[in-house]
Amino acid sequence: MKRLSIILAALLCVVLATMKVSAGTGDANEVEKVREFYRLYAVAFSISDNETSFAKCDSVMNIYCSAEMCKDTKKDRTSGIAYDFATDNIGIDSLALQTLNVKYDNGAYIVTYKYNDMNDKRQKFIRDVKLKVGMKDDKIESVKAIE
């Protein structure tokens, strides 16, 4: 009985350790994966034809994002809202390609970049974007704007 308890405890430790790794380890490969997603997404998002842009964004998201995030994005687009889940509805463009930075901090990836934005009065300005990106099972699962 004691041996079974030890084996179960060891198995539980292995499972918990695996779950922690899949939540995001911050290793160079994962940081580069998040960076590559935002590079590709910025190019797709910048396409002027909405139909082509949405198709390319969906394609990139299908590779790098969780099934749930992809499902929410498609559902939102078909309802006509077109909320941008990958940037927490801030947006991304070619300027982001030049200023994109990704670092791992306290269990999440912090993505920063500059974005050509426009205010309600249609005046252009450069926005500093900071996103907190959560990973699960080697896929982007959540994105939340911070600050």
Residue ranges and their predicted role:
Residues 122-147:
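Short beta-strand edge/turn micro-motifs at domain boundaries
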Residues 26-49:
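Short, aromatic-enriched amphipathic alpha-helices that serve as compact interaction elements
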Residues 75-121:
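Surface-exposed, charged secondary-structure patches
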Residues 1-26:
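Bacterial Sec-dependent N-terminal signal peptides
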Residues 51, 120-123:
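Short consensus segments that form the blades of beta-propeller domains
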Residues 47-76:
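Short, well-ordered alpha-helical segments enriched in acidic and aromatic residues
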Residues 31-35, 113, 130-132, 145:
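Generic alpha-helical hydrophobic packing signal
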